[in-house]
């Protein structure tokens, strides 16, 4: 309960994001708290996605994509971040998600 109060009263976005990412997939929290966390994460999708990539947390990435679909632009940014920071598990997960959701465009090398 105190984490939810800290989430609601804090003005620090990094702290609010951290709490929401830790709490939204826990099963023992009340449904109304989960709804608040999910609403927040939907509004802050790109920072949430990039934070999970930096943490190399594929379980939370899976949980996040079950509540909201990732836009192609945010997904591409996350792929670039995962590759540049050598977050292999997150990179593989993101590439699989991209293949399943958007597919990859075939390049035409004809002359």
Regions found by a protein language model. Name each.
Residues 1-111:
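Ankyrin repeat (ANK) tandem alpha-helical domains that serve as protein-protein interaction scaffolds
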């Amino acid at each position: 309960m105190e984490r939810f109060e800290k989430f609601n009263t804090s003005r620090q976005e990094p702290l609010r994001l951290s709490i929401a990412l830790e709490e939204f997939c826990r099963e023992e929290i009340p449904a109304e708290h989960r709804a608040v966390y999910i609403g927040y994460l939907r509004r802050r999708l790109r920072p949430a996605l990039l934070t999970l990539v930096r943490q190399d947390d594929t379980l939370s990435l899976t949980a996040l994509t079950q509540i909201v679909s990732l836009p192609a632009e945010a997904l591409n940014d996350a792929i670039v971040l995962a590759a540049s920071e050598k977050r292999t598990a997150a990179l593989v997960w993101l590439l699989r998600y991209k293949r399943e959701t958007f597919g990859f465009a075939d390049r035409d090398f004809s002359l």
